[in-house]
Amino acid sequence: MAVARAALGPLVTGLYDVQAFKFGDFVLKSGLSSPIYIDLRGIVSRPRLLSQVADILFQTAQNAGISFDTVCGVPYTALPLATVICSTNQIPMLIRRKETKDYGTKRLVEGTINPGETCLIIEDVVTSGSSVLETVEVLQKEGLKVTDAIVLLDREQGGKDKLQAHGIRLHSVCTLSKMLEILEQQKKVDAETVGRVKRFIQENVFVAANHNGSPLSIKEAPKELSFGARAELPRIHPVASKLLRLMQKKETNLCLSADVSLARELLQLADALGPSICMLKTHVDILNDFTLDVMKELITLAKCHEFLIFEDRKFADIGNTVKKQYEGGIFKIASWADLVNAHVVPGSGVVKGLQEVGLPLHRGCLLIAEMSSTGSLATGDYTRAAVRMAEEHSEFVVGFISGSRVSMKPEFLHLTPGVQLEAGGDNLGQQYNSPQEVIGKRGSDIIIVGRGIISAADRLEAAEMYRKAAWEAYLSRLGV
């Protein structure tokens, strides 16, 4: 490792000079608030620094005596690093996609694959090791062997132990502690900042697990932010904050889909099940006897039982049209619905039109990023476009209708329809997942349940079963 040590000081300095290390208060992918954020994506615009990083990564692999046939960079920041390594040293490279394309070869791994060969993984930063493991699994499914990974910076938060538990040796050019030591010696950061970051590292270490799932005896895993903590985030939308607070208070992340055709039944459901839910979803255009007086009664019940009203209108027209649909017509949705939703097909105009009406009334909007029906086209690039649109209009958009967590920003809510206690489907293409799958594994926040409650002999009992299942899945996700 002599070459790596000799080059470490200038390398850390170079990365600091291009603002790869940021100190302050940052929300990480996990939802944790961190005093440091590491972003190496900018080095692609600095060829000399890119080559310097690639060279030291390759030298680290050589010094470790690793034998390998191909190289694969973890998408996306490590891809250019792997490219430079392979081009400079004439080594075959493989590219792992994050998702399968709907056209062409539809392969997850591009390049010449020879089953039985060993592939070396390149990564820029390792925290928990999850991204490396995802790449390992994809490569192993192609018949390749993976034994080692080279990383530029190990954040020392359990990633090395987690990878070791899965049979992967992690070799780092530099640890976060060493990087801080160098920056402090160069007087680029002060002792107080170094201490704060080191305390954060020590207090937030991910638990490793063996192949059988049993935890190894290392420090406690970090918890993601609770609903209550997310409600207090400085950039949280007021409607999202209100919803998260009442969810925490009532211990419910259940939204009732009240798809009934009579106003009397709608109000009965709201009154009887209101204490069990955080939100009531309406399809107001299927009410046979709709009046604005009915919605006034619903607002009264919502205030009494502390739940929000969500009109599942699915706006999908040009801005001027949705604006009129939202504020006018016989439904006057903006006058009573806390939240509405919209498709992103028309482009940002649909959000801008709704926003003109909703912002002054302190309303919010959910974008449809994924759908729970068979053959839905709301996948891939469509979903990513929905996330970008939400980020660009976060003053009005509070989250998503989706089958899983599509944004790692804790300010955004994720609501998932198509939930039943047992997975399955119907004869019209609806697919159902369990609360544990949706909340515990896919990272959603709120389950939307309709027929599982409406069709039950005892609706209150059914609602409580769903509430408890969803809340327990949420607590399990927190590690409580």
UniProtKB/Swiss-Prot annotation:
Gene3D superfamilies: 3.40.50.2020, Aldolase class I (3.20.20.70)
Any one GO biological process: pyrimidine nucleobase biosynthetic process
Keywords (A to Z) from UniProt: Acetylation, Decarboxylase, Disease variant, Glycosyltransferase, Lyase, Multifunctional enzyme, Phosphoprotein, Pyrimidine biosynthesis, Transferase
Metal-binding among keywords: no
Span list, region OPRTase: 2-214
Disulfide feature: none
Modified residues (Phosphoserine): 214
PROSITE patterns in UniProt: OMPDECASE, PUR_PYR_PR_TRANSFER
Residue ranges, annotated region (Domain linker): 215-220
Glycosyltransferase keyword on record: yes
Domain of life: Eukaryota
Residue numbers binding orotidine 5'-phosphate: 257, 281, 314, 317, 321, 372, 430-432, 450-451
Binding locations of UMP: 257, 259, 281-283, 317, 321, 372, 430-432, 450-451
Modified-residue entries (N-acetylalanine), positions: 2
Enzyme Commission (EC) number: 2.4.2.10, 4.1.1.23
Signal peptide per UniProt: none
UniProt GO molecular function: identical protein binding; orotate phosphoribosyltransferase activity; orotidine-5'-phosphate decarboxylase activity
Reaction catalyzed: orotidine 5'-phosphate + diphosphate = orotate + 5-phospho-alpha-D-ribose 1-diphosphate; orotidine 5'-phosphate + H(+) = UMP + CO2
Start and end residues of each stretch annotated as OMPdecase: 221-480
Family to which the UniProt record says this protein belongs: In the N-terminal section; belongs to the purine/pyrimidine phosphoribosyltransferase family.
Cross-referenced PANTHER family: OROTATE PHOSPHORIBOSYLTRANSFERASE, URIDINE 5'-MONOPHOSPHATE SYNTHASE
Known disease link: Orotic aciduria 1: A disorder of pyrimidine metabolism resulting in megaloblastic anemia and orotic acid crystalluria that is frequently associated with some degree of physical and intellectual disability. A minority of cases have additional features, particularly congenital malformations and immune deficiencies.
Name under which the protein is recorded: Uridine 5'-monophosphate synthase
Gene: UMPS
